[in-house]
């Protein structure tokens, strides 16, 4: 058995008038995350964690923000590519542990929907997905959010 651990991080600034999407779930209609794609920072962090565990290039190198193909692209496309590479290398996801740091929106009311979405996207049971919402407690300016994710991959 071979185990690999990956860590992913992403942060985006809030912008008015854009849909906020986290983990493939529409959360807020009045403000979203600034980004070249749909700005789903949670899926970006998960994608980077998987790519990192596999020793691959990171999401920004593979899906450059200067490439018009990725303008407003759904972030699930990036995740699907990482999962494809993972599968080709013979790995499966054992579990993921994610943290969203933001003063707004509150994550708790959306937690189960996000976990259900991640379960479908990743092809693993919800019980193997940990999702936590944390507040910045006065640290930094609070005009965006940060997502971090650790993934454990296993090859039998």
From Swiss-Prot:
Keywords: Isoprene biosynthesis, Lyase, Metal-binding. This is 2-C-methyl-D-erythritol 2,4-cyclodiphosphate synthase. Homotrimer. It comes from Aquifex aeolicus (strain VF5). The record marks 36 as: Transition state stabilizer. Its cofactor is a divalent metal cation. Pfam families: YgbB. Pathway: Isoprenoid biosynthesis; isopentenyl diphosphate biosynthesis via DXP pathway; isopentenyl diphosphate from 1-deoxy-D-xylulose 5-phosphate: step 4/6. Binds 1 divalent metal cation per subunit.
